[in-house]
C-alpha cells in the first residue's frame, strides 16, 4: 500500500515537453549596414558559401573580413553577426551548438539531444538548465534508468525542485519505490512545501500495522505542516489524542480547528466539552499521577505523563522534557517511543539539534523508525 501511495504521488508530477529557445542567436542572415567594400565583399561571399552549406569556407571569408585594418564598430558588429549566423546554421561553435541543442529538442530528436551534451561541454555551454533538458530527453526516450543515472552523475543530491520531480518520476516508471521515497523526502527537505509534505505523510500513513499512537504522530505532523484542511482530519486528530489520554492536546486541536473556521456545529461542541472536561480532570489529579508514575516499576507512565504535559503547550515543554528523561532513565518498555517523545518535546522547546539526535536514536522497530524519521525531517526543515 505504501508503494501505491508514493507511486500516486509520482504520477502527479507531469513531464513537460515545451519548446526551448537559445537567447541571442541569429537565425536569419544578418542585414549588412554601410561597410567598406573590403569588408562587404568577403561577407557576401561568406553568405553565399553558407547558403550552399560550405561552412568552413564561409567562416574563412568571415575571418578575411575580420582581417581588414581599422574596422569600425559597425563593421565589427556586422562581422560578428555573420559569424554567429554561420555557426548557428552549421551547428558549430558555442552558439551553433546551443542552437542545434534547442532545435533537436524542439524536433523531438531526443537521442541527438543527449549526444549534444558532449558538444555543449566542449564549447562551455553545458549548464544546469541544459543538463536538466538532457535528463528529460532520457525520460522521454523511455530510458528511465539512464535518466536517473544522468541526474545522479551530474546533480547528485544538489538538483533543484524540477530535477528532483523528474528523478521521482523516473523512479516511478522503474518501479523503484525506495528511490521514489528518497526523491519525495528530498523535495520535502528542499522546498518544505505543504503539497510534498502531504504526499510524504499520506505515504507513511498507508504503512500496514501502524498503531493509533503512530497514526496520531502523523496527524500531529499534518497539523504542523499545514496539510490539515478538512474537518474530518481535525476531528480524527482530536479523537486520537483524547483516546490515548492527551486531553489538553485534543482541546487545543479543536480550538485551532474552530479558529481556522473548519470546525463548527454540535459535534464540535460536544467534542470540545469532552476534551475540556477530561483535561480538567487530568489537571486535578496530576500530583497523584506523578506519584504513581514514580512508583511504577518502569518508565512508561513517566513518558506518557511527559507527553501529556507537552500537549499542554507553550510553557510546559521544559517539564515535559524532564519527565520523559526520567522515564528513559527508569527504563520504558518502548524505548523508541520514549525517544520520539523526547525529540518532540526538545523541538517544541526550541532545542532542534537535541531533537534530531533523539529522533535518530529511535532506530529499533521499523514503524517507529518511520515516525522518528518524519519528525527528524520536520525538525530540520522548521
Predicted features along the sequence, with ranges:
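N-terminal leader/linker segments that initiate helical-solenoid repeat arrays
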Residues: 4-8, 13, 22-110, 115, ...
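Long, contiguous interaction/recruitment modules in multidomain scaffold/adaptor proteins
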Residues: 2-5, 9, 13, 18-35, ...
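Generic helix N-cap/helix-start motif at coil->alpha-helix transitions
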Residues: 34-44, 73-79, 89-99, 109-112, ...
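Alpha-helical repeat scaffolds
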Residues: 61-64, 92-101, 111-120, 144-155, ...
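Conserved small-residue packing positions in alpha-helical repeats and bundles
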Residues: 46, 84, 101, 135, ...
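Structural motif corresponding to the intra-repeat A-B loop/turn of tetratricopeptide repeats
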Residues: 52, 90, 107, 141, ...
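Residue at a conserved register position within TPR or TPR-like alpha-solenoid repeats
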Residues: 49, 87, 104, 138, ...
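C-terminal soluble interaction/assembly domains
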Residues: 298-382
Amino acid at each position: 500500500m505504501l508503494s501505491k501511495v508514493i507511486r500516486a504521488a509520482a504520477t502527479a508530477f507531469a513531464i513537460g515537453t515545451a519548446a526551448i529557445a537559445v537567447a541571442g542567436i541569429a537565425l536569419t542572415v544578418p542585414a549588412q549596414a554601410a561597410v567598406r567594400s573590403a569588408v562587404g565583399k568577403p561577407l557576401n561571399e561568406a553568405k553565399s558559401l553558407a547558403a550552399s552549406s560550405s561552412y568552413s569556407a564561409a567562416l574563412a571569408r568571415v575571418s578575411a573580413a575580420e582581417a581588414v585594418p581599422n574596422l569600425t564598430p559597425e563593421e565589427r558588429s556586422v562581422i560578428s553577426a555573420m559569424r554567429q549566423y554561420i555557426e548557428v546554421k552549421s551547428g558549430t561553435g558555442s552558439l551553433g551548438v546551443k542552437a542545434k541543442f534547442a532545435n533537436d529538442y524542439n524536433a523531438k530528436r531526443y537521442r541527438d539531444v543527449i549526444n549534444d551534451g558532449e558538444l555543449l561541454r566542449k564549447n562551455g555551454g553545458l549548464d544546469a538548465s541544459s543538463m536538466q533538458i538532457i535528463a528529460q530527453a532520457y525520460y522521454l526516450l523511455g530510458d528511465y534508468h539512464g535518466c536517473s543515472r544522468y541526474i545522479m552523475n551530474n546533480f547528485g543530491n544538489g538538483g533543484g525542485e524540477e530535477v528532483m520531480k523528474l528523478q521521482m518520476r523516473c523512479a516511478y516508471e522503474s518501479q523503484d519505490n525506495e528511490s521514489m521515497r528518497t526523491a519525495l523526502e528530498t523535495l520535502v527537505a528542499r522546498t518544505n512545501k505543504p503539497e510534498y509534505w502531504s504526499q510524504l505523510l499520506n505515504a507513511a500513513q498507508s504503512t500496514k500495522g501502524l498503531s493509533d499512537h503512530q497514526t496520531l504522530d502523523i496527524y500531529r505532523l499534518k497539523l504542523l505542516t499545514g496539510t490539515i484542511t478538512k474537518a474530518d482530519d481535525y476531528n480524527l486528530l482530536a479523537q486520537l489524542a483524547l483516546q490515548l489520554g492527551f486531553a489538553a492536546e485534543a482541546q487545543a486541536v479543536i480550538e485551532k480547528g474552530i479558529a481556522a473556521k473548519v470546525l463548527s456545529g454540535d459535534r464540535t461542541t460536544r467534542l470540545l466539552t469532552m476534551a475540556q472536561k477530561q483535561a480538567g480532570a487530568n489537571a486535578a489529579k496530576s500530583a497523584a499521577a506523578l506519584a504513581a508514575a514514580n512508583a511504577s516499576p518502569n518508565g512508561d507512565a513517566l513518558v506518557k505523563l511527559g507527553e501529556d504535559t507537552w500537549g499542554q503547550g507553550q510553557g510546559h515543554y521544559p517539564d515535559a522534557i524532564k519527565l520523559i528523561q526520567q522515564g528513559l532513565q527508569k527504563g520504558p518498555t518502548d524505548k523508541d517511543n520514549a525517544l520520539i517523545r523526547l525529540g518532540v518535546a526538545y523541538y517544541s522547546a526550541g532545542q532542534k539539534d537535541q531533537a534530531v539526535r533523539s529522533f535518530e536514536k529511535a532506530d529499533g522497530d521499523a514503524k517507529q523508525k518511520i515516525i522518528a524519521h518524519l519528525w527528524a525531517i520536520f525538525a530540520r526543515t522548521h
